[in-house]
A protein has these predicted regions:
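Gly/Ser-rich helix-loop-strand patches that form or flank binding pockets
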Residues: 128-176
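Short beta->alpha connector loops
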Residues: 12, 123-126, 149
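Small/aliphatic-rich secondary-structure junction motif
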Residues: 3-83, 112, 116-118
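Short, conserved glycine- and acidic-residue-centered signature motifs
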Residues: 15, 94, 98, 157, ...
Length: 176
């Protein structure tokens, strides 16, 4: 029997399916669920800006924070590929986006019946971040989407799900 589940999310539709399944399993077996998100520092800023717009992250974050999301589109003078180290403004925006993604996912999991839900974020390669969060949470199951937001990158470097599946020391459930 499983005793702790980690569900990884990047805010994509496939990740939402994984959250729903993980929440259902956590509720059924009455085990804790950790919702994990790897901050998206390696993602092109225009792609992040589009995601923030489509998912209404900008509006949600700006209700409580004073943030200039124009930095994602380049209007704020920055791009993730412009330097090897993102500016402090870019770090703040990506961190706030990550917090919003993980908090929405936790709310979704609770609404689906999970009773014990906590959250983690990581700043790492996506696969390594997920594996580290699973270890930190003491998870004996990882639930994640088959393919998230990084379709092009996964074609070049292999999918995050594939890497997690190959290196995890626990059960990995991949949702399509």
């Amino acid at each position: 029997m499983k005793t702790h589940i980690l569900v990884a999310t990047d805010g994509s539709d496939t990740a939402n399916k994984a959250i729903d399944l993980a929440a259902e399993l956590a509720a059924k077996f009455d085990v804790p669920l950790t919702v994990g998100h790897v901050l998206q520092f390696g993602r092109p800023s225009r792609e992040l800006a589009r995601m923030a717009e489509v998912e209404h992250i900008v509006e949600s974050v700006q209700k409580t924070q004073q943030v200039d999301f124009n930095i994602l589109s380049g209007a704020g003078g920055g791009d993730l590929f412009a330097t090897s180290r993102p500016s402090s403004d870019m770090v703040r925006v990506i961190t706030l986006m990550g917090d919003e993604i993980v908090n929405r996912a936790a709310d979704r999991a609770r609404a689906a019946g999970a009773k014990q839900v906590d959250t983690l974020t990581a700043d790492d390669d996506p696969a390594d971040g997920i594996l580290d969060m699973a270890e930190k949470a003491g998870a004996d199951m990882i639930v994640m989407g088959h393919r998230g937001l990084g379709r092009v990158r996964s074609l070049l470097a292999g999918s995050v799900a594939q890497k997690v599946n190959n290196h995890a020391e626990c059960t990995v459930v991949t949702v399509r």
